[in-house]
A protein has these predicted regions:
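Thiamine diphosphate
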Residues: 2-75
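Short gly/pro/ser/thr-enriched loop/turn and capping motifs at secondary-structure boundaries
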Residues: 21-24, 47-49, 72-77, 84, ...
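Glycine-rich, anion-gripping cofactor-binding loops and their flanking helix/strand elements
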Residues: 32, 50, 174-175, 187-283
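Conserved thiamine diphosphate
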Residues: 36, 83-129, 295-297
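Short beta-strand segments
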Residues: 41-43, 64-71, 92, 102, ...
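Phosphate/pyrophosphate-binding active-site segments
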Residues: 101, 105, 109, 262-300
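Conformationally flexible catalytic loops at phosphate/diphosphate-handling active centers
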Residues: 120, 124-181
Length: 300
C-alpha cells in the first residue's frame, strides 16, 4: 500500500531500488543536496533493519529523512509470523522522532489522524534529522477500498506551514554580542555545517577576525586561512597568535590540530542553529542556537 500510494501521487518523484541499504543512502544523498525531507519506504522485517546505517549518517549529519517502514499488525508481533520483527523504536536514539501508526481505517476521524501524523512527521524531520513512521497493515501487498479523498478534512490544515521544525525559542543574539564585545584577538572556526552560510564571512568582517574553514564546512569563500592546519600544528605560532576567543560554527573539528586549538582555547563559544552538542573537550563557555546571518546583523 505504501508503494502504491507513492506511485499514484503525481507530485512525488519516485525512485525504485532493489536494495534497501542502497535506497536509504540514495535518499540520504537527495536530502543532503536539497536540504528537504526525503522519504524512503520499505517492507517489514530485516528490510527495515537495512536502513540503519543511513539513519545513523542522517542523524549525525542532521539530514532530514522520513522512514516509512511497513509492518505486520500488532497481533502478529512476537508469535513467529513471517517477515516480522519488533520494529518499534528500531533505530533507537538515531531517529529523532518515532510513531507506531494505527491500522488504516475508513472515515473522517481516521483521515484526520493520518493528516496530523503526516504533518508532524514532516515537521519533525525539518528540525532536521531522520524520523521513523512504522506502518502496520494486515494485508501488506493488497490495496483495500477506493483511494481516500481528503476533501474537507484537508481544509483544516490549509494554514499550517510545513517548513519549520519545533521552536527552540528566541535566539540569544544579545548574549553572543556581549560575549565577543571588546575582544580583539578572536577566531572563527568552521566545522561541518548543515547549511553553509556566506554570512559567516560578513560576521568575520564586522568583527575583524580571521576565519578557518575545514573542508567539511562546505564553504569555499575568500578570506579564509588556507594553510591553517599547518599553522595550528606549530606551537611557536600559537604562542604568538593564540586567540582570546574561539567561535566554533557547527560540528567539532575533525583535524587533530583543530581539536587541539578548540580544546585549549581560553574561551570557546559554539554557534549552531540546531543547538548541536559539539564539545568533546567540555570547554564551551556558551552554546548559541542562532544562524550566522542573525549574528552578522547583530554584531554591529
Amino acid at each position: 500500500p505504501i508503494a502504491l500510494a507513492l506511485a499514484r501521487n503525481e507530485r512525488i518523484r519516485l525512485h525504485v531500488h532493489l536494495d534497501e541499504r542502497a535506497s536509504a543512502f540514495f535518499a540520504l544523498g537527495l536530502a543532503k543536496a536539497s536540504d528537504r525531507p526525503v522519504v524512503v519506504a520499505c517492507t517489514s522485517g530485516t528490510a527495515a533493519a537495512n536502513l540503519f546505517p543511513a539513519v545513523v549518517e542522517a542523524w549525525t549529519a542532521r539530514v532530514p529523512m522520513i522512514l516509512l517502514t511497513a509492518d505486520r499488525p500488532p497481533e502478529l508481533r512476537g508469535v513467529g509470523a513471517n517477515q516480522t520483527i519488533d520494529q518499534r523504536e528500531l533505530y533507537g536514539r538515531y531517529a529523532r522522532w518515532f510513531t507506531d501508526a494505527p491500522l488504516p481505517a475508513q472515515g473522517p476521524d481516521s483521515m484526520r489522524t493520518w493528516m496530523i501524523l503526516g504533518h508532524e512527521a514532516y515537521r519533525q524531520a525539518c528540525w532536521p534529522g531522520p524520523v521513523h513512521v512504522n506502518l502496520p497493515y494486515r494485508e501488506p501487498l493488497v490495496p483495500a477500498g477506493d483511494p481516500v479523498r481528503l476533501g474537507s478534512v484537508a481544509t483544516g490544515f490549509a494554514g499550517v506551514s510545513l517548513g519549520e521544525g519545533p521552536s527552540a525559542g528566541e535566539p540569544d543574539i544579545g548574549g553572543f554580542v556581549d560575549a565577543v564585545a571588546g575582544v580583539e584577538r578572536g577566531l572563527l572556526y568552521l566545522g561541518s555545517l548543515r547549511t553553509p552560510s556566506p554570512f559567516i564571512l560578513d560576521l568575520a568582517t564586522r568583527l575583524g577576525w580571521p576565519v578557518i574553514a575545514e573542508p567539511t564546512s562546505g564553504l569555499r569563500i575568500p578570506g579564509t586561512l588556507r594553510a591553517a592546519q599547518f599553522l595550528l600544528s606549530s606551537e611557536a605560532f600559537l604562542e604568538i597568535h593564540r586567540p582570546e576567543v574561539v567561535v566554533q560554527f557547527g560540528a567539532a573539528p575533525t583535524s587533530r590540530a583543530g581539536l587541539g586549538l578548540v580544546g585549549a582555547a581560553s574561551r570557546l563559544l559554539i554557534v549552531d542553529p540546531d543547538d548541536l552538542v559539539a564539545d568533546p573537550h567540555g570547554r564551551a563557555e556558551h552554546r548559541f542556537a542562532v544562524h550566522a546571518g542573525q549574528l552578522a546583523h547583530g554584531a554591529v
